[in-house]
């Protein structure tokens, strides 16, 4: 899988939705508290970006697997798996690698901060996966966008402030 296919699979242009609250929280903490923790910033950045890309790839993969009509309505152009003739194995490999990176960097962030990050991380990862996947995905429910807005708008913003202010690292 080439870089262009990967970027289309993870819909890189949509990552602004998760990066905006992350960067806003960081700018706020810089302005209000004059604090910035490079290590925590980078750990959360990588974890957040990898997880966002993984959930988008999962969504595209499930759309590909569940497609009833595979022609028309721009399906051939909009689904990267079809457009670039990506193998299921390569798509699943990308998803697994992104999830491993997201979890790994998330655990490192938790170890560098506090259990609050772990608890919110577990809840956020669960909602992110269940948003697209499961017997009844959250996105198909009437309150799907409320869940999305709460986690993308509040939890990411809160954590992006919290990681810079928390001084009680579990691992020193």
Where does each model-flagged region fall?
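Generic hydrophobic alpha-helical membrane-span motif
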Residues: 17-19, 58, 69, 93-94, ...
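Cytosolic-side membrane-entry/anchor segment at the start of a transmembrane helix
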Residues: 1-21, 131-144
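Membrane-water interface at transmembrane helix exits
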Residues: 25, 29, 33, 59, ...
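Intramembrane alpha-helical segments
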Residues: 79-168
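Membrane-embedded alpha-helical segments that form the functional core of polytopic membrane enzymes
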Residues: 22-24, 28-61, 118-129, 169-172
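Aspartate-rich (DDxxD/NDxxD/DxxxD) Mg2+/diphosphate-binding motifs
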Residues: 51, 55-99
